[in-house]
A protein has these predicted regions:
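Short-chain dehydrogenase/reductase
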Residues: 153
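Beta-rich nucleic-acid/ligand-interaction surfaces
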Residues: 149-150
Length: 317
């Protein structure tokens, strides 16, 4: 399948340092555990709706939710209008499926002073986006933590291969809720607990939203989702998986632990762009665009929690 159009957005707000609070013992405990497992000495968050005027220690916990919802709308507009007028009209009149993704599922309970309407937008499905793309067929939401985008792409790949739909639109974002970010990293890095980073530093979590439009119409980026590989070695070049002779670059969208050296031939997306949960794998396309790569293939690897990994390949012209 081909990536016909896509758009990213991250907050304009600055980074804010997280401060543990005795009012939330479990969150503070998860924070300390996550620091140990990632070998860091602090955590910075960049979130939509962060407000400088509130108490400093609460900035990362209590952002406004409206800017996040508005960002989803803006990024969808950008992806739609980056297509040609002919393609845009074809999308609106063709068989189109809509998939909404996020990392946490029903996370509205962590939002501050949220209405029931906005709660349903974040937790279930943004109805304004469904109307924007004139979706009259399939809509669904995938909550798969770091694998959300990969699972949605695999579903889109099947839909297009079976000729069920002409276009598949995937929209979603990563809401960097501190407690959930801490527990997620603790699970990913549990096997390397209590080790120190090669270079001590601060973890960075950045909220990002994205919209991706897939079709069978030829474009500059061709995507293929591989299977999940249940192996304990986490080696993305296993010879019995798939021929890797045409892989020029390897992008790693794993946990943010830095206790082991990263191979020189690979791209650590989190070290380069910051951690964005389910949106992190899509940063490999941003890397291709940023460095204007031509005529090659980039493999993006998403490691599992226990062992194994999933991957998808991107051929760029």
């Amino acid at each position: 399948m081909y990536l016909s159009s896509y758009s990213f957005m991250e907050p304009d707000e600055p980074f804010y340092l997280y401060y543990p609070s005795w009012l939330n013992v479990w969150e503070s405990h998860s924070y300390n555990t996550a620091l140990k497992t990632t070998g860091a000495n602090g955590w910075r968050f960049k979130r939509f709706g962060s407000r400088r005027e509130i108490y400093t220690r609460e900035i990362t916990r209590r952002p406004e939710h409206t800017p996040y919802i508005n960002a989803l709308d803006k990024v969808s507009d950008a992806a739609l209008h980056s297509m040609s007028a002919k393609e845009r009209m074809m999308l609106l009149k063709s068989r189109t499926a809509f998939i909404y993704i996020d990392s946490w599922g029903e996370s509205g309970v962590f939002e501050y002073n949220i209405s029931s309407l906005n709660l349903s937008t974040i937790d279930t499905l943004p109805k304004n986006l469904v109307k924007k793309f004139s979706i009259s067929d399939v809509t669904c939401k995938i909550r798969g933590e770091n694998f959300s985008l990969y699972q949605a792409m695999a579903m889109a790949q099947d839909y297009l291969a079976w000729d069920v739909f002409d276009f598949v639109v995937i929209c979603g974002g990563y809401r960097a809720v501190p407690l959930l970010a801490f527990t997620a990293e603790s699970m990913i890095q549990s096997e390397v607990k209590n080790k120190k980073r090669l270079i001590p530093g601060i973890n960075i979590s950045i909220e990002r939203v994205g919209c991706f439009i897939f079709s069978k119409r030829e474009s500059d980026l061709k995507i293929h989702c591989g299977p999940y590989i249940p192996t304990a070695t986490n080696n993305p070049h296993l010879p019995d998986v798939e021929n890797t002779d045409d892989i020029d670059l390897l992008a790693y969208a794993g946990g943010i632990n830095k206790t082991k050296p990263f191979p020189h031939t690979g791209i650590d997306l989190i070290a380069r762009y910051g951690c964005s949960g389910c949106m992190t794998p899509a940063l490999s396309w941003q890397y291709i665009n940023q460095y204007a790569l031509h005529n090659g293939c980039l493999r993006t690897v998403i490691p599992g929690v226990v062992s194994g990994y999933a991957y998808f390949d991107t051929w760029y012209q």
